[in-house]
Amino acid sequence: ANNKEDAHEEPTIKRSRSHDYVSREVINVRENVGLIEVANFSKHEFKGTDARKFLDHVMAGKLPKPGRISLSPMLSYRGKLCGDLTVACFDENEFMVFGSGAAQEMHRRWFESHLDKFDVNYKNRSDEFHGISIAGPNSRKVLEKIVRDDVSNEKFKFRDSRRMFVGGVPAIINRISFTGELGYEIYVAPHYQIKLYEELMEAGKEFNIKPFGGRALMSMRLEKNWGAWTLDYRPDFTAKETGLDMFINWDKDFIGKEKAKSENSSSKLTPLIVETNDIDVTNNEAVMNGDQSIGYVTSGGFAHFVNKSVAFTFIDQNKIKSENKIQIEINGDLFNCSVIKEPLYDPSGQKMRS
């Protein structure tokens, strides 16, 4: 908003008055650098000689080597999703798992229920770390001004994780970003959060650093075809249905493996472009093919940088008839849709790896 008096919404089922403000935030991240708080992520710490063995058991994905990060689904015994997590390895006996803050208690109970056969110490450290993410083509330039470590692309690669001082503050830095841009998640103790914010804002002045919010973040992930936990990824769905099976390591044993291997659902997470001018999906809208319902919306909105209305849907692929258009019903009206074949923004992923 331009000022405090301007910071309000007006109830509407169409695009709200904040639409243009969110667009400005997205464009600044894509072209310069932005900053957003990430204190909401959960942080689960595992230490001990069996730390890797334990995580290999509960995680379906391949675990990272020391200094690296991997993305991994976590499955239930029924082969359904119970987590979409980021795993950081500090050394062979120490890991930090980052996940949804909303699901942290569910994940805590799940981890604790499987600890008894392993020599591993587990602690939920979510309240001990807050954090800020910086993202955009100038984010490295900002970081370089307030660290002593070499954070060049050669020395601090995409999906690296390190402990270092940032603006004099001890931090954990993960080189990842939910925006699809070059970016860093910087985690610090809560009492350092304001200091970190001030250091980043001061260092980023010459690069036009500006805060951005959750709506901008969710818009940017739509442009990358990335689902979100509680919306597109949830315990109702399998890894195969959501496309998260691409992260599964089938060469090891893990909870839910046999169920996941035998799963044969024809329902798939399918991103769509929606042909609409002033209204977007939220969730649970019907997806139609002719006069037949073939699925439903799990999330969506406006992808500001590519200027498209996007819907993430679960569609039964066996019900699609090619002679009929795919449409979504929004507020009683049907809107034509087309399937998104590849990410609308930076499909090769070069920007976040640069």
Task: Tell where the protein language model's regions lie, with residue ranges.
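Glycine/proline-enriched, intrinsically flexible loops and inter-domain linkers
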Residues: 1-354
